[in-house]
Amino acid sequence: SGPWMCYPGQAFQVPALPGCRPLLKLQCNGSQVPEAVLRDCCQQLADISEWPRCGALYSMLDSMYKEHGVSEGQAGTGAFPSCRREVVKLTAASITAVCRLPIVVDASGDGAYVCKDVAAYPDA
């Protein structure tokens, strides 16, 4: 496996990680996340191999914004009415850490838990 195996629709379903959407909304609002929601999200993420996990989270965040008529590079809060964008991005980027699922950060095979590309989602 490797980064070339990470195409949306191939490495993960599109829309990506439907089970993680409620987790993201609850977490960025500072709400308590029910165990079942956490379990669903982490299971969906665990079903995706290490390389594409961040891509799947990026795709999920992207589609949540786009469904509310926001394109990359534009500010929009429709998807997350009471969350600041920085919080949304960092929360999404940390879902792998919340689930304790490793990701591959670079080609050297270094593993970590936070998806930097998701945290850097270009929306502002």
Curated annotation (Swiss-Prot):
SUPFAM superfamilies, alphabetized: Bifunctional inhibitor/lipid-transfer protein/seed storage 2S albumin
Tissue expression notes: Endosperm.
Disulfide bonds: C20-C41, C28-C83, C42-C99, C54-C115
PTM info: The disulfide bonds are essential for the inhibitor activity.
Keyword Disulfide bond tagged: yes
PROSITE patterns: CEREAL_TRYP_AMYL_INH (PS00426)
Keyword Disulfide bond: yes
Cell location: Secreted
InterPro entries with a match to the protein in the record: Allergen/soft/tryp_amyl_inhib, Allergen/tryp_amyl_inhib_CS, Bifun_inhib/LTP/seed_sf, Bifunc_inhib/LTP/seed_store
GO cellular component terms, A-Z: extracellular region
Record Pfam families: Tryp_alpha_amyl
Keywords: Alpha-amylase inhibitor, Disulfide bond, Secreted
Oligomeric form and interacting partners: Homodimer.
Biological role: Alpha-amylase inhibitor.
Protein name as it appears in the record: Alpha-amylase inhibitor 0.53
